[in-house]
């Protein structure tokens, strides 16, 4: 058994003093309480084998809520053209998507803090209510400004949902058992992500686009009802504080800095490298630099004496295991979403498959991804270890991105299906256990802050996962296009980022065979560079997983502040809400 368990204490050679392992939660939290768990967590014998009705009621309500948020995240992908035309969005159409990601990312750390101050129940119910209000505004919108405003409110609600669903599950389960339930929760989220685009297309074709948003209202009502009755959770932190005292503890300045920084970054990534601005344009350079500086300023403020109650305490970064695990989450999102967006581009531009056939092929990757996440979470629960799972997973990712570089127009459909299945295993296996690695080195009292930061990194990485490969692809394609022998009319239809939009068999078949061959060759070479960049990103994941310590997964909670309320506990007083 490794000596790097939750209660590890390292002795300094040549000294009688004991030095706490910085990766051990006992060095960061309640040491005496954690030390009492040393023997009980070593063999996992105290892991609970069964769960009561109260737990399953909460788990089902969280799963339905997670399904709702993930479905909304994808439903606009197929409906955006129709919605944009209906509200005359014109060039503002991109913000119908991006403002949702902006607010859902920027406010996640705030929800973690609110959950610590007010408990989990009311922030969660508020998030569902805000999401429903945003959906209603979007559905009733008659212009792009109202629609974008509604989407911003939707994202504000989604920020709470995405953070608190995982956080509440962490409160209910000891560390060792979280992986398998996170895997099950992920199944609901993936189903929502898969159904979202399909449902968006059906609604636009068969009914009014407004039902893309109005359909959320009955689901929100169901979620609110389930959560209202199921979330019978305790909260014993600051019970005697008044509402005004609690408000004063919110890190408003930090949240404002983060919102501005995220907005600047997303603006630069949205407009850079397109028809409006080149990457070298002063506007893009300025917003990008200010966005990066803003994130640095946010970290500096959180560590400063002016921030007495930070949304993101630097304690989260004071050991290598949590830092490595946060890095793994960013890498996993960058690689998985990069593959999810650019494999269909390969299918449609190089293999000249229709969007429907492309969708069928990508199912191999998606299904493997989904099932592997559940299996990976179960493995970590069974073994009580996560490091080996992560090393194997990120090694598979790196190898598969390398294999993708040799894909070309002659690759068979069977080969593509098999490669998709293997790649799905690589990106799926670690999905439900990376948060476990983060929290293995931290006390359970930091669950809210660590989960909120985890969700924020995931959301921001999702934006980068599309924009970074797209910028690389467009830049490479434009360079190759400028030196090709294609005539100017063909070049004008493909330059300045239009190659991604034109990736379809209909576009290819509109040209003579020799021209088709040249265009396909440009796509092959441009995609090859994307896969090569993803190789490097995945390799960072291998290095980060090697830097992790394989800390013991605790089989008992180390805090009694949160979790299921005991039967004999009274309902909270109004002052506690």
From Swiss-Prot:
Protein's UniProt keywords contain Transferase: no
Q: List the disulfide bonds.
A: none
In alphabetical order, the GO MF annotations are:
transmembrane transporter activity
Q: Which InterPro entries match?
A: MFS, MFS_dom, MFS_trans_sf
Cell membrane is among the record's keywords: yes
Q: Which residues cross the membrane?
A: 52-72, 94-114, 122-142, 155-175, 184-204, 211-231, 252-272, 283-303, 333-353, 360-380, 388-408, 417-437, 453-473, 527-547
Which segments show compositional bias classed as Polar residues? 1-17
Where does the UniProt entry place glycosylation sites? 240, 319, 410
Compartments in which it is found: Cell membrane
Q: What induces it?
A: Expressed exclusively during fungal penetration of host leaves, the time point at which plant defense reactions are triggered.
Q: How does it sit in the membrane?
A: Multi-pass membrane protein
Which GO cellular component terms, listed alphabetically, does the Swiss-Prot or TrEMBL entry include? plasma membrane
Sorted alphabetically, the keyword list is: Cell membrane, Glycoprotein, Membrane, Transmembrane, Transmembrane helix, Transport
On the tree of life, the source organism's domain of life is Eukaryota
Mainly resides where? membrane
In this chain, the stretch annotated as Disordered covers 1-47, 558-577
Identify its protein family.
Belongs to the major facilitator superfamily.
Role played: MFS-type efflux transporter; part of the gene cluster that mediates the biosynthesis of a tyrosine-derived cytochalasan acting as a fungal signal recognized by resistant rice plants and leads to avirulence in Pi33 resistant rice cultivars. MFS1 might be involved in the excretion of the signaling tyrosine-derived cytochalasan.
Q: What is this protein called?
A: MFS-type efflux transporter MFS1
